[in-house]
A protein has these predicted regions:
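Catalytic centers of hydrolytic enzymes
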Residues: 1-213
Length: 213
């Protein structure tokens, strides 16, 4: 039995061993593949997308993610929930918000995956909301479990929304109630792809780069 699970030191070596069993490769080929796989892990240096020059708080990161998601989807603004701990909510808490901060260091795709509400491969959602609906959501937060204990939204916008005007909103955290009241659209834009492009446009990022103007 040759295990060829996801581990990146085993997958390709496992397949090469299967080739050996089938007579399509030599043992030297298997050893060479194993050496290459081990080297790729031990000496792997992920690409640095940008460099953060000072600690960015959870809210700072939410502001940057909001700009990124809004611009990537052609939205007017963004509502980004924060993954704070709320007593009484299920232990899963909020998987659709910004949950961490960024420290002063080179930023890789792994660092982005930690702060992105979409993780590695989920897509960005958008929704059409009036300014009044936006204000209501800011007051109530993302009510993930329908119990009135909402996770706070951060409004990311170049202008203050007008109550009677309708906006396209990139949103991170859609409650069942909101999904029933409004049309939520899958933009088809993968959050990680958008983030790599957005953050990669900066050689360095500091708090001075957060404002959307």
């Amino acid at each position: 039995f040759i295990y060829s699970g996801w581990e990146n030191t085993i997958v390709t070596t496992g397949f090469k061993m299967l080739d050996f069993i089938k007579g399509n490769a030599t043992m030297e080929d298997v050893i060479r593949q194993l050496d290459e796989d081990q080297d790729s892990v031990v000496n792997n240096t992920p690409d640095v997308i940008t460099t953060v020059t000072e600690e960015l708080s959870q809210q700072d990161c939410a502001m940057l993610v909001g700009r990124c998601f809004a611009q990537a989807t052609g939205s007017d603004l963004a509502l980004v929930s924060l993954s704070t701990w709320i007593p009484g909510n299920p232990t899963d808490q909020n998987h659709y918000g910004v949950a961490a901060k960024l420290y002063a260091k080179g930023i890789t795709d792994y660092d982005l995956s930690v702060i992105l509400p979409t993780g590695w491969n989920r897509t960005i959602q958008t929704v059409a909301l009036t300014g009044q609906q936006i204000n209501d959501l800011l007051a109530s937060g993302y009510d993930a479990y329908g119990n009135g204990k909402g996770y706070p939204y951060v409004l990311v916008s170049p202008v203050q929304p007008e109550a009677g005007k309708t906006y396209q909103v990139a949103i991170c955290g859609v409650s069942d109630q909101l999904a029933a009241e409004a049309t939520v659209t899958d933009s088809g834009v993968v959050g990680m792809d958008a983030a790599k492009a957005f953050f990669g446009a900066y050689t360095t990022i500091s708090r001075a780069d957060i404002a959307w103007s």
